[in-house]
């Protein structure tokens, strides 16, 4: 017997949320060209072939064994720009671990494939101009992080703005200013994020204060965001060091940070004199198959992709980190500046319909906890990208978030339904501004339909897999969602229904009352 959900047209308001709640990342390594996560094979995506464990026999950086080379993304591509613009105004974050070691070669000093000593990648002026044009074309707002590596300074020397000034000034002069900035990406992983040799948490606090003061003095319109970390300890203890419970699981969303040396949020922020405008953290549902052999406790197999434990991680993280936000940035928004189904490039099913319930549940759950922005990692790179790398063909998760942005307004409402197996229910105002409610009902059961009782006629938008949960395309009310002949977006139209409606096993259905 499946769950029964009763919808209502009279719900209590929880809060208003940032209109750019749904935003995304463009990795700096995409812009410059460089290494990123190795692509899965078709058989691995289908779940018929296992992902081999990484080969560490060559030594060096343990993560490098899981990477491959990718040429720079073409941010001038008409399809890419069209699909990004369809999402409406979003924050566009250009960052990632690679950004910490990227040299801004705006004077064209270095030939392709080379970088100054102490840096890994080189960003050319033309590449950055193309990125700025992209942000402008899609009505985006630009957020970045900056370089902080051996090429810029040693650990016992303070950070200096010689590189950061180049990218801030060029962006502002071009008419696409940096409107928000994090100092660096994931500073909690001190030894594996590109920092100067022997860099410590104390060095970071010193440099972050220097950077934040420099930004405020020279670019006062730019919001200061941080610390942009992935802190497993935050899942165990509150900011005062008190355990949440005896069985708290540090690996619940720690991702890669759990396997590498790291410091805590408190290590990064205690004693800092420059305050944050926005508190940020990173969240993944553990790690993908690429790192499952190294971190089995942080890996969830496909059969657990709709479990309460797996889907509950986003809200759990938000509730835990909101306590740190309240301590270090009281009254500020909370931004998840990197988010996805799994660290290390996404699960094998990230590009299929099976990722859609998690994607939509994350947005809905987060908005019930706090106000802020979720930056999906990524727009168009690796298996967790909303668009397929290179071709920019939209994946099921792209159309899912497009529907969210089309239907769900910025006022969060109390759904009146407890989150439970088979029924994850979220409610917002209508995006069109009309009186009424927009609901999302996610059926997390693999076998039972969920029955929804409507108080009146509603427009129904039912999302399902195309014949299977790991399908490459998705159906809306039984019609396949694919681009038209000239990249036209398919009609995202609802069906008027009344009485009772069934949400199929694994289905995600929007109801607009």
Across the structure, where does each feature detected by a protein language model lie?
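Glycoside hydrolase catalytic-domain groove-lining segments
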Residues: 120-123, 284-344
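Histidine-centered active-site/metal-ligand motif
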Residues: 186, 282-284
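Aromatic-lined glycan-binding groove of carbohydrate-active enzymes
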Residues: 275-282, 290
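Ligand-binding pocket segment of bilobal, Venus flytrap-like solute-binding proteins
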Residues: 352
